[in-house]
Amino acid sequence: MIANETIAAIATPPGIGGVCIIRISGAQAHAIAVNITHKKNLVPRQAILSHFYDLSGEQIDQGIVLYFPAPHSFTGEDVVELQGHGGIAVAHALLSATLDFGARLAHAGEFTQRAFLNDKLDLAQAEAVADLIHARSQDALRAANRSLQGVFSQKIDALADELLRLRVYVEASLDFSEDEIDFLGEGKIREKLVDSLQKTQQLLAQSQQGQLLNDGIHLVLAGKPNAGKSSLLNALLGEERAIVTPQAGTTRDIVREDWIIDGIPVHLSDTAGLRESQDLVEQEGIRRSFDAVKRADIVLLLADGSARDNDARAEFVSLQEELHQLAPHAQFLVVYNKADLVDEQTAGDGLWISAKTGAGIEILLKKIATLAGKNQHEETVFIARKRHIHALESVEAHLQRALQQLEQFFVAELVAEELRLAHLALGTITGTVSSDDLLDEIFSGFCIGK
């Protein structure tokens, strides 16, 4: 990114629509807008009706021009928005005119990156812009808004300030060590360390909830043929998404659907029935099913509840053990289907449902939400990403080591160093500590017009 260049991009989705918006940012934004509108003076923050012209003077469209002079704009630079009639030809003609008059095409996320570099928002807030756009549920939308408003950043900054003050206090013990002032021994440092560690762990738990709303979970329906996996998929989605027949082995390939449960995005996979097969196509489907289980966060292991013979039960137990070994990280929930065909339901730790009648489905949904970790109060959750989680886990580890150094070895230098490293890890979240590579990676995932 070259900061002194003026950039432009289409800020609205491609295709036919009511309005198209061209966004321009940089020192030449006002001059470019004057050339396109043929108006000598653009009143700041006022919508002005204008014709739009290309480099040859031919009229392109009629619409609205808005001018936001620096520093009171989204990017902190001079910003202009040209709002024309929606349509592919109009949008591209307006964009071409901005480029002809001196702008260059913006890179993905470059408007938001300039806002970050001009201190209009920190890195966590910048990421929240993209998360807001990609939110797939109302819970995710509200959480992204909290991050954009600075709720997450304020918590990070407050914790960073505490760690900095604590580090100064510890380092003071080094400066006054010869004066027989026992800073470490008086207990205040340990008390503050424990408090900071607890706040970090609370923040980590809230961030994990935010990541859950952002990334969702991978949920796999697995089991023997004819257990009712495809019927359950259809029951959960409320539509006939998968083919259901009495014939075992109907599902040959994985059927994937994105779904929302209690505000959590769920990547749902219905898999082929797991059994020995001589059919080459079915064998490939079974192999893919095992791969899906390996990647799952939650596995719903379905059993045919109407199959009461000992052989069927033994096969199910064997499959259960095999899948647990295959995916030790995943959470498993045993689900007994076809409750409508059974008079007596005894299932130990499993749930009874009927995909056909819908019995037990509501209980199953609540159980899935619980397994996914939906347990935070809505007003405390903000959107978070994997890198935020990793940074907070690093902070937690450094504070735990600092506490260990304090309690076991009483070495102030090592305590101060762990506090310094914890403080640096926090800085990577809001961007007070960042590299060009990290910034490029983050902003390259944005839309061109953002």
From Swiss-Prot:
<dbReference type="Pfam" id="PF01926">
    <property type="entry name" value="MMR_HSR1"/>
</dbReference>
<feature type="binding site">
    <location>
        <position position="251"/>
    </location>
    <ligand>
        <name>Mg(2+)</name>
    </ligand>
</feature>
<dbReference type="GO" id="GO:0046872">
    <property type="term" value="F:metal ion binding"/>
</dbReference>
<feature type="binding site">
    <location>
        <begin position="337"/>
        <end position="340"/>
    </location>
    <ligand>
        <name>GTP</name>
    </ligand>
</feature>
<dbReference type="GO" id="GO:0005829">
    <property type="term" value="C:cytosol"/>
</dbReference>
<protein>
    <recommendedName>
        <fullName>tRNA modification GTPase MnmE</fullName>
        <ecNumber>3.6.-.-</ecNumber>
    </recommendedName>
</protein>
<dbReference type="InterPro" id="IPR027417">
    <property type="entry name" value="P-loop_NTPase"/>
</dbReference>
<feature type="binding site">
    <location>
        <position position="450"/>
    </location>
    <ligand>
        <name>(6S)-5-formyl-5,6,7,8-tetrahydrofolate</name>
    </ligand>
</feature>
<feature type="binding site">
    <location>
        <begin position="226"/>
        <end position="231"/>
    </location>
    <ligand>
        <name>GTP</name>
    </ligand>
</feature>
<dbReference type="InterPro" id="IPR027266">
    <property type="entry name" value="TrmE/GcvT_dom1"/>
</dbReference>
<dbReference type="GO" id="GO:0005525">
    <property type="term" value="F:GTP binding"/>
</dbReference>
<feature type="binding site">
    <location>
        <begin position="270"/>
        <end position="273"/>
    </location>
    <ligand>
        <name>GTP</name>
    </ligand>
</feature>
<dbReference type="Pfam" id="PF10396">
    <property type="entry name" value="TrmE_N"/>
</dbReference>
<feature type="binding site">
    <location>
        <position position="230"/>
    </location>
    <ligand>
        <name>Mg(2+)</name>
    </ligand>
</feature>
<comment type="similarity">
    <text>Belongs to the TRAFAC class TrmE-Era-EngA-EngB-Septin-like GTPase superfamily. TrmE GTPase family.</text>
</comment>
<feature type="domain" description="TrmE-type G">
    <location>
        <begin position="216"/>
        <end position="373"/>
    </location>
</feature>
<keyword id="KW-0963">Cytoplasm</keyword>
<dbReference type="InterPro" id="IPR025867">
    <property type="entry name" value="MnmE_helical"/>
</dbReference>
<dbReference type="InterPro" id="IPR005225">
    <property type="entry name" value="Small_GTP-bd"/>
</dbReference>
<comment type="function">
    <text>Exhibits a very high intrinsic GTPase hydrolysis rate. Involved in the addition of a carboxymethylaminomethyl (cmnm) group at the wobble position (U34) of certain tRNAs, forming tRNA-cmnm(5)s(2)U34.</text>
</comment>
<keyword id="KW-0460">Magnesium</keyword>
<keyword id="KW-0479">Metal-binding</keyword>
<keyword id="KW-0342">GTP-binding</keyword>
<dbReference type="Pfam" id="PF12631">
    <property type="entry name" value="MnmE_helical"/>
</dbReference>
<dbReference type="GO" id="GO:0030488">
    <property type="term" value="P:tRNA methylation"/>
</dbReference>
<comment type="subunit">
    <text>Homodimer. Heterotetramer of two MnmE and two MnmG subunits.</text>
</comment>
<keyword id="KW-0819">tRNA processing</keyword>
<keyword id="KW-0630">Potassium</keyword>
<dbReference type="GO" id="GO:0003924">
    <property type="term" value="F:GTPase activity"/>
</dbReference>
<keyword id="KW-0378">Hydrolase</keyword>
<dbReference type="InterPro" id="IPR031168">
    <property type="entry name" value="G_TrmE"/>
</dbReference>
<feature type="binding site">
    <location>
        <position position="23"/>
    </location>
    <ligand>
        <name>(6S)-5-formyl-5,6,7,8-tetrahydrofolate</name>
    </ligand>
</feature>
<feature type="binding site">
    <location>
        <position position="120"/>
    </location>
    <ligand>
        <name>(6S)-5-formyl-5,6,7,8-tetrahydrofolate</name>
    </ligand>
</feature>
<dbReference type="InterPro" id="IPR006073">
    <property type="entry name" value="GTP-bd"/>
</dbReference>
<keyword id="KW-0547">Nucleotide-binding</keyword>
<feature type="binding site">
    <location>
        <position position="81"/>
    </location>
    <ligand>
        <name>(6S)-5-formyl-5,6,7,8-tetrahydrofolate</name>
    </ligand>
</feature>
<dbReference type="GO" id="GO:0002098">
    <property type="term" value="P:tRNA wobble uridine modification"/>
</dbReference>
<dbReference type="InterPro" id="IPR004520">
    <property type="entry name" value="GTPase_MnmE"/>
</dbReference>
<feature type="binding site">
    <location>
        <begin position="245"/>
        <end position="251"/>
    </location>
    <ligand>
        <name>GTP</name>
    </ligand>
</feature>
<dbReference type="InterPro" id="IPR027368">
    <property type="entry name" value="MnmE_dom2"/>
</dbReference>
<dbReference type="InterPro" id="IPR018948">
    <property type="entry name" value="GTP-bd_TrmE_N"/>
</dbReference>
